[in-house]
Amino acid sequence: MNTLFGKTKEEAKPIVLKSVDEYPEAPISLGTTLVNPTGDWRTFKPVVNEEKCVKCYICWKYCPEPAIYIKPDGYVAIDYDYCKGCGICANECPTKAITMIKEEK
């Protein structure tokens, strides 16, 4: 099919966003962990290495839950009550400052 938003690849080129900052903020729907904390059912959890973090906030933008927040010093942190351990943040981090480690029970 090779379409985007009902347009062919060539027609869609002008609407493809080049920067993370160009993407719109998405609202949080009622089915998220905002109203349903995950608790501790994760298998893996993300851990931030501040020495590698460049404060680009890509992890924060891509996190599907309200689990990543920005601390007063500008670094990101994980609120494990809301993190479901999906690993999107670690996968999107350009400097690999976030690693997924086995959850200890």
From Swiss-Prot:
Entry note: cofactor: Binds 2 [4Fe-4S] clusters.
Domain 4Fe-4S ferredoxin-type, chain residue ranges per copy: 44-73, 74-103
Which reaction does this chain catalyze?
A: 3-methyl-2-oxobutanoate + 2 oxidized [2Fe-2S]-[ferredoxin] + CoA = 2-methylpropanoyl-CoA + 2 reduced [2Fe-2S]-[ferredoxin] + CO2 + H(+)
InterPro entries referenced in this protein's UniProt entry, alphabetically: 4Fe4S_Fe-S-bd, 4Fe4S_Fe_S_CS, PorD_KorD
Keywords on record: 4Fe-4S, Electron transport, Iron, Iron-sulfur, Metal-binding, Oxidoreductase, Repeat, Transport
What does this protein need as cofactor?
[4Fe-4S] cluster
The entry marks the following residues as binding [4Fe-4S] cluster 2, namely 63, 83, 86, 89
Keyword flag Phosphoprotein: no
Enzyme Commission number(s) from the entry: 1.2.7.7
Q: Name one GO molecular function term.
A: 3-methyl-2-oxobutanoate dehydrogenase (ferredoxin) activity
Q: What class of enzyme is it?
A: oxidoreductase
Q: Write out the residues that bind [4Fe-4S] cluster 1.
A: 53, 56, 59, 93
Indicate the quaternary assembly.
Heterotetramer of one alpha, one beta, one delta and one gamma chain.
Output this protein's name: Ketoisovalerate oxidoreductase subunit VorD
Provenance organism: Pyrococcus furiosus (strain ATCC 43587 / DSM 3638 / JCM 8422 / Vc1)
Phylogenetic lineage:
Archaea, Methanobacteriati, Methanobacteriota, Thermococci, Thermococcales
Gene that specifies this protein: vorD
